[in-house]
Each structure stands twice: as structure tokens, then as C-alpha cells.
């Protein structure tokens, strides 16, 4: 139960940070996703690896962390799309 509470608190805090960044710059988004696994500090001081493009994030002095993927998108690098271009890029139901 404690781990789930800590996870919710951590993810909730990250969501607030992401929302705060989003509120500062409307054309930029920073997203954080939990990768479904945790990481652990080993006796030699290294951390267990996380899957895929996920990285281990942990507090100083702790031996457990969360595997998270982060992504930054700057929408100012994309031109203004026309309605036709947006329609063409919209996913269609199967």
C-alpha cells in the first residue's frame, strides 16, 4: 500500500510540474509517463536498468526509484497546418 501511495504522490507531483510548465509556454509540452516498473540501487552503487526509452528517477539517499519516460515537444517548430492537412493526419477508426 505504501508503494502505491508513494507512486500516486510522485506521479501527481510530476503531473503538476508538467502542467506548470505547460501553463508557462503554451507552445511547449513536457510529458512524463510511468513505464510500469521500478528501479533499485544495487550494492555496487549502480541502478537497475529500465526498459525501452525509460530512465530511472530517484530521490537522493533512496534505494528505490521509478522508471519514467520523458518527452519534450516544442510546437513552434511545426508550421501552421491547414484544415485539410489536419484532417489527413487524424487517426481513423478501424
UniProtKB/Swiss-Prot annotation:
Its main location: secreted. GO terms for cellular component: extracellular region. Keywords: Disulfide bond, Glycoprotein, Secreted. It is found in: Secreted. Signal peptide: none annotated. The lineage of its organism: Eukaryota, Metazoa, Ecdysozoa, Arthropoda, Chelicerata. It comes from Ixodes ricinus. Disulfide bonds join 35-54, 39-56, 50-67. Salivary chemokine-binding protein which binds to host chemokines CXCL1, CXCL2, CXCL5 and CXCL8. This is Evasin P1172. GO terms for molecular function: C-X-C chemokine binding. Glycans are attached at residues 38, 44, 53, 80.
